[in-house]
Swiss-Prot record:
Disulfide bonds: none annotated. GO terms for biological process: organic phosphonate biosynthetic process. It catalyses: (2-aminoethyl)phosphonate + CTP = CMP-(2-aminoethyl)phosphonate + diphosphate. Mg(2+) 1 binds at residues 116, 226, 228. CDD domains: PC_cytidylyltransferase (cd02523). GO terms for molecular function: metal ion binding; nucleotidyltransferase activity. Monomer. Mg(2+) 2 binds at residues 145, 226, 228. Pfam families: NTP_transf_3. Pathway: Phosphorus metabolism; phosphonate biosynthesis. Keywords: Magnesium, Metal-binding, Nucleotidyltransferase, Transferase. This is 2-aminoethylphosphonate cytidylyltransferase. Cytidylyltransferase involved in the biosynthesis of cell-surface phosphonates. Catalyzes the activation of 2-aminoethylphosphonate (AEP) to CMP-2-aminoethylphosphonate (CMP-AEP). Can also use phosphocholine, with much lower efficiency. Exhibits strong activity towards CTP, limited activity towards ATP and no activity with GTP.
Amino acid sequence: MACVKGSNAEKTNAIIMAAGLGTRMAPLTKTTPKPLISVNGTPMIETVINALVTAGVERISVVVGYLKEQFCYLEERYPAVVLVENTEYLEKNNISSIYAAVDVLEQGATFICEADLVISDEHIFQPRPSRSCYFGRKFSGHTGDWVFDLDDSGKIVRIGKGGSDTYAMVGLSYFSAPDAKRLARFMHDAYKETGHEQLFWDDVVNNHIAELDLSIHPVEAQQIAELDSVAELAAFDHGYVYLLRS
């Protein structure tokens, strides 16, 4: 695609995964990629980009696939943004989006972010984490969603679905330069394996969890929201309530 630029090494990087179909947000996603759906006046992905820019991130690689042309305006609006195309988004899970931007990991410390988030606190990435981490929200009770198990020192020892009274994944993470380079190597290795097509990128992290130094960076519910359905969107932005009546 013409609007996708080449890559240059930068000091601090970010990868935003924006290639997916967003089928649970239909009918809106039939014509608009989920990250570009406006929530209270701002496209979701722009709340993520704004927070990264506020934190001084120099290069933000937005990995696109579905309706990719609609993201081109971001390169004009944000000098730090570079679009990277994921040509495998229909055939493979989101491991393919990280692999499409694996060169970013090889260049240094990197934030990895989902694109379909609403970040209300533009300072969520400040101060910059001092070590590799997943941002997580503490919860009570049991959930079947993605969670983290921690050891007594606070190090993450498992990433997976299902857990009780721990931290839930919110779609943001940070890898120090050494860990980012390790993750790049793990991604290359995973891509050689049969069945990698079904993997989430977090599965690769979990498979090598002992080789990475990952902790939790706690966040509060009012700082960030992940909207997975039209009902959740309508609860967050009442301008979409009409969709619940159709």
